[in-house]
């Protein structure tokens, strides 16, 4: 079941409104959409969101780590977010339109999965470039490689720019071709 995603301040009303529906609540955290708030505040926001009832946490990576090639810093950051999220699913938003190259997208995808991401997501939906097919292909192939090496199935979410059913069908077809029907 897909979750309803809200800002941290809206978790309590969302949990209350959805309490008997079986629909989980997700929260955008870590200074969404820029991800530039101080590290300790980003970690605290994740912890507070989980405590308030969020079952999924969407985090925004620090793009500066990818752009500077500091993959260890990105790993450590996402690993800390994973620990703060506890039992909640962790979705890492790569903001691919701001990563500069497909190579950075591939590396950021792999680093986030290695650090414990349950999903990797293209965009916040606020960037000037959101989900694209080339970026999605790179991310899906990273997921496939990670699965082949670890046996762990990581989810994928395209975000931003998908406004029609036919847009979604293109991405569903790509996912099915690259990963197979179990990812649908």
Q: What feature does the model see in each segment?
A:
Residues 1-3, 9-156, 163-184:
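Alpha/beta enzyme core
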